[in-house]
Regions:
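A short His-aromatic
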Residues: 110-112
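A short glycine-rich, Lys/Arg-flanked "PGG" loop and its adjoining helix->strand segment in the class I
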Residues: 118-130
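Class I (Rossmann-like) S-adenosyl-L-methionine-dependent methyltransferase catalytic domain
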Residues: 1-34, 43-92, 116-119, 135-209
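A short acidic, Gly/Pro-enriched loop at the edge of an enzyme's catalytic core
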Residues: 93-102
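A short beta-strand submotif of the Rossmann-like class I SAM-dependent methyltransferase core
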Residues: 105-108
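Short acidic capping loops at alpha-helix termini that bridge into adjacent secondary structure
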Residues: 81-83, 98, 131
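Conserved beta-strand/loop positions that form the S-adenosyl-L-methionine
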Residues: 40
């Protein structure tokens, strides 16, 4: 396999469980009077639907046409709306600077080599408004791999050679690396969830002109 379109075509509506800290995130967003939310790598739509239900103006992107199709269908079933766009998070985001009050991305951006992941983080910073919030989760454990065979093309990166995510690079974060790569954020929370993912809730620092 090796690409998300193949995964969604084969497995259908997957990754449906709401991330455990989303209630806290939503509460903080409402306290901030946030309106415009980017769901980066929306998959089949679990968080897009959740945020739309809460009344936010949601834009959702994903690299998979099938994932977006499922998201669109789910929104329609719930009589909700969101802006959907096919896009890879490792390419320049198709949005102007300072567009969003918050960016949400769960178990998405670590699926590439480190330089690509860092580019994605820089784009998250660009499209966020000053003091905007980001809730990002990434892989934390390089030993619990979803493959019996893999290669390690560069440090802290493995590529499964079999299984559902065959051919997809996975960059594995440490707490130190999280703080380094998200240095432009005031980190409000940084913890490991039950699924061995680093979960970061941060506020973009305002940079003096």
């Amino acid at each position: 396999m090796g690409d998300w379109e193949s995964i969604f075509k084969k497995s259908g509506k997957v990754f449906l469980k709401i991330q455990e800290d989303m209630k806290r995130v939503i509460s903080l967003l409402k306290k901030d009077k946030a309106k415009k939310i980017l769901d980066l790598g929306c998959g089949s739509g679990r968080h897009t639907v959740l945020f739309a239900k809460q009344g936010f103006d949601v834009t959702a992107t994903d690299v998979s046409k099938s994932g977006l199709k499922m998201t669109r269908k789910w929104l329609k079933e719930e009589n909700l709306s969101a802006k959907l766009k096919e896009h890879s998070c490792y390419e320049k985001f198709p949005f102007k600077d300072n567009t969003f009050d918050a960016v949400i991305s769960t178990q998405v951006i670590h699926h590439n080599f480190h330089n690509k992941v860092k580019f994605c983080i820089s784009e998250i910073e660009r499209v966020l408004k000053p003091s905007g919030l980001a809730f990002i989760t990434v892989s934390a454990n390089k030993y619990k791999r979803r493959a019996s065979k893999f290669e390690i093309p560069e440090p802290r990166t493995y590529v499964p050679l079999d299984g559902e995510e065959k051919g997809l690079p996975h960059f594995i974060y440490t707490k130190t690396l999280m703080r380094k790569d998200f240095k432009n954020f005031q980190i409000l929370t940084l913890y490991k969830d039950k699924g061995d993912h680093w979960c970061l809730l941060g506020r973009l620092k305002e940079i003096a002109p």
